[in-house]
Amino acid sequence: MWAWSDNQGNPEDALTLDEMLDNIMLYWLPGTATSSARLYWESFAMGVASVRLEIPVGVSVYPRETIRPSRRWVDRWMPNPIRYNILERGGHFAAWEQPALHAKEIRDCFAKVR
């Protein structure tokens, strides 16, 4: 949580201890941590940029995300971006850390395709 959240040196700056434990238990109790990591393993094994997305896409770049795509990279691999936005806060768990900001990003993106 420390490396992947938007915190000031302490994960509890981004999420409460209860929130972190709740999330960890969702993976620990049913034993699904390994299967949830499969997406990452498969994506990196085949190369993140090996497939072009020709469909309209929205890209939100959070400052503490583990991979932050540049506009140039997005234009190369996603030739139909309808939204590209660099945000001031949020990390890999942006929907969890900044739910209102994340919801606004989704709304603003889909407002362009109505």
Language model feature labels by segment:
Residues M1-R114:
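C-terminal subdomain of alpha/beta-hydrolase-fold enzymes, centered on the catalytic histidine
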